[in-house]
Amino acid sequence: MTNIVWHQHPVDQAARAEQKGQNPVLLWFTGLSGAGKSTLAGALERALFEAGFHTYLLDGDNVRHGLCKDLGFTVEDRDENLRRVGEVAKLMVDAGLVVLSAFISPTREERDSIRARFPASQFIEVHVSTPLSVCEQRDPKGLYVKARSGEISNFTGISSPYEAPLAAELTIDTSKGDLATQVRALIDYLTAINVINADKAKALA
């Protein structure tokens, strides 16, 4: 690695962000399977996109069809899955995008490792805190049934622990209130920290 140096591009993150008229950021949605991470992140992305933002949503299932298709679900593979996603998200933020990532990401160490790649103002942890009982009742992919029967091992929330964030920037329980209200809470937060400026906030009203 000593012979590899970082090549400085003539166009930097600030220039890309200025061209797009937005402040790049990573919103990291974490929570149990079935908590509503992808639904919430997708609804927020749709609202931002329609208001003229340049966005991209990284989804836990989708990246395993390509970027991480060679990985399984051992502890080591799950760590590598998130390491890769964190690096991709960093590149996307450097490109000036508003990036949304929806991953169970069960350990604080994993999430903190990704947070450490970004300036404090560019990483927003969103804990989708929907209770296990609700997630299991929803069970959209039938995974909890398989986990309870022993067909799936190391399943987060059943046979493997989930470590809730200690200081997430936002906490949303999708079993309380409706999706529009939850998206509004996210938009209000992004406006308060100036990710969304006043002019674009009007388009999201």
UniProtKB/Swiss-Prot annotation:
Known EC number: 2.7.1.25
Highest taxon in the source lineage: Bacteria
Sequence positions that bind ATP: G31, L32, S33, G34, A35, G36, K37, S38
Catalytic activity reported: adenosine 5'-phosphosulfate + ATP = 3'-phosphoadenylyl sulfate + ADP + H(+)
Keyword Kinase appears in the UniProt entry: yes
Active site residues according to the UniProt entry: S105 (phosphoserine intermediate)
Any GO BP: hydrogen sulfide biosynthetic process
Pfam families noted in UniProt: APS_kinase (PF01583)
Top-level EC class: transferase
Listed GO MF terms: adenylylsulfate kinase activity; ATP binding
Keywords of the record: ATP-binding, Kinase, Nucleotide-binding, Phosphoprotein, Transferase
InterPro entries cross-referenced by the UniProt entry: APS_kinase, P-loop_NTPase
Function comment: Catalyzes the synthesis of activated sulfate.
NCBIfam families cross-referenced by the UniProt entry: apsK, PRK03846.1
Record's protein name: Adenylyl-sulfate kinase
Annotated source species: Shewanella baltica (strain OS185)
Chain's gene name: cysC
